[in-house]
């Protein structure tokens, strides 16, 4: 309501008094904030996709010459936490093991987990990525021919599998997991 009236808002915070007036509010898809960190590169591509892999969702935004194409904004309702939950549940059911951490296997790092558990984790992670790629393809996005910029902590976790999978033609990774919050 106060935005429409453009009135000043007075408040106290930590013992100091403030008076502010909000003149303009902009809202962007979450993935775009991360894209800005790579703008000089992205503006040279006629088309690129920002793929922000989070805990509960994977958000996708199409860019044309570095600018958001808001006609193509997708959200896949399965992030890495849903992957973890699936792996943990299946591992418990098949091997009566409670997994605390499967990141080492996903990152292809040394682990004490037995071979069959490692294979299960790799297999389920591969299926997770395939399901996501199919979700995109159903919406007209083909990662085998597109430049894809991956953001978020989930993308760094899955980076090795994405690169080794050879399904994404031009993967670029934003190393800063806080890029969306800048």
List where the protein language model places each region.
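Short beta-strand scaffold segments in enzyme catalytic cores
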Residues: 58-62
């Amino acid at each position: 309501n106060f935005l429409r009236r453009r009135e000043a808002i007075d408040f106290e915070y930590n013992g100091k008094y403030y008076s502010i007036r909000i003149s303009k509010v902009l809202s962007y898809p979450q993935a775009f904030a991360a894209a800005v960190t790579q703008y000089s590169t992205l503006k040279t591509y006629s088309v690129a996709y920002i793929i922000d892999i989070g805990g509960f969702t994977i958000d996708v935004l199409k860019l044309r010459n570095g600018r958001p194409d808001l006609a193509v904004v997708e959200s896949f309702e399965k992030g890495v936490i849903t992957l973890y939950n699936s792996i943990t549940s299946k591992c418990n059911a098949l091997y009566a093991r409670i997994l605390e951490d499967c990141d080492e296997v996903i990152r292809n790092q040394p682990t004490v987990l037995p071979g069959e558990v490692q294979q299960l984790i790799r297999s389920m992670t591969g299926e997770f990525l395939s399901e996501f790629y199919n979700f995109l393809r159903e919406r007209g996005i083909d990662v085998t021919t597109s430049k894809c910029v991956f953001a978020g902590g989930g993308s760094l976790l899955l980076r090795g599998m994405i690169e080794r999978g050879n399904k994404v033609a031009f993967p670029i990774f934003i190393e800063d997991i806080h890029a969306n919050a800048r």
